[in-house]
Amino acid sequence: VAGYVAYLGRYMYFDKDGIVVETSEEGTPGIPQVTGLSFSHVILHEPLPVENQAVFEDILNITQLLEKHSLPVDKIYFSPDYQVTLIFGEARVAMGPSDDIDEKIMGLQYMLPSLEGKKGTLDMREYTEDTKMISFEPD
């Protein structure tokens, strides 16, 4: 299971290909909720009908990287233009497009402890291994 989406009061769990494999009335700790995707219906054992099916490759890549670096994300948000924001409790991490996300997640593992208990947005959209450019905007 790669993640889940909320739909009509239930949680729809999907695999790496975006196929809905299970439904539940509650979320499962350790599996991120994916938000921001648009779809008009959900059918068990069929792919989620999203506009850009490639988003599931991004979701799988992101969840594997987060797991590899022991970063327990609560939600993964995709904006309409597929900009990624990771949500850890009350803190949001704006990652930007999924290009170079592995480099950003690698850097995030060292920054996340300092976000604990904070509300706001850590902006990593311009972050690279060379520039290490970030900013934090409290709520």
Question: Where are the regions that the model predicts?
Answer:
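Charged, solvent-exposed interaction patches on well-folded alpha/beta domains
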Residues: 1-139
